[in-house]
Amino acid sequence: DSTSDQHEWFLEAKKAAKSEYSNRYIFTKSVWDAPPQYRMMCGLCERDGNYMVNYFSSQPALNYGFHEITHPEWQLPCDHPDCLATAEAMKDVMRFWLDKGADGFRVDMADSLVKNDDDKIATAKIWRGVRDMLDTEYPNAAMVAEWCNPERAINNAGFHMDFYLDHYGNGYSRLFRYGEFGDQAVFNPNGKGDIKAFADEYLPNYEKTKDNGYISFMTNNHD
């Protein structure tokens, strides 16, 4: 979803001179163009434009394209050659580490590749391409998504596993940390928790995905 702002790709992309990396990241057309619905970093590049980050300022977003184009002057479609090149470059990164002996990948912010992709259809298509590559070239490798939507991550995008994140109030968090002081959690010894809140969320997701992959429970920080 992103690289470091010190990555050699980004150091080339932020230059004013055009190169094969100019569209590797998402830049606006002008430094004065910073739509508020996106996280943008302003005034840090030689080129005229602001760059999008996925979260922190040091995480420039890789450009896999936009599913819905709202600013055609700088947004590229998913099938643009430069966006396709980004996906292929990331496959090469994966091949590098798999050839070194890695067993697979935990994928940060797995649902965030393609922008303006509310239903994650275009994002899932990219991950399906990655899964096809793994099945063909590295059949023993596995991927786990930081997604917390197993139907999309496993059934649609092809992940082997999807993290069940403990978002406050969801079924998983109700097991361990719920209520102002954690006193409404299922495993709190006071016995006030309700296992049904967990079961009602988990079991339907399990039934939908059990033949295709695994819902992965974290035992510590998801990172």
For the regions a language model picked out, list residue spans one by one.
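Active-site-proximal helices and loops of the catalytic beta/alpha 8
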Residues: 2-33, 92-93, 103-215
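Active-site-adjacent "subsite" loops/lids of carbohydrate-active enzymes
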Residues: 3-100
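Sequence-level motif detector for i,i+2 pairs with an aromatic at +2
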Residues: 50, 57-59, 160, 212-214, ...
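Structured loops at beta-to-helix junctions and adjacent beta-edge loops in soluble globular domains
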Residues: 56, 65-67, 146, 166, ...
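The substrate-binding groove and active-site-proximal loops of carbohydrate-active enzymes
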Residues: 58-87, 110-122, 181-196, 223
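Catalytic grooves of carbohydrate-active enzymes
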Residues: 95-98, 219-223
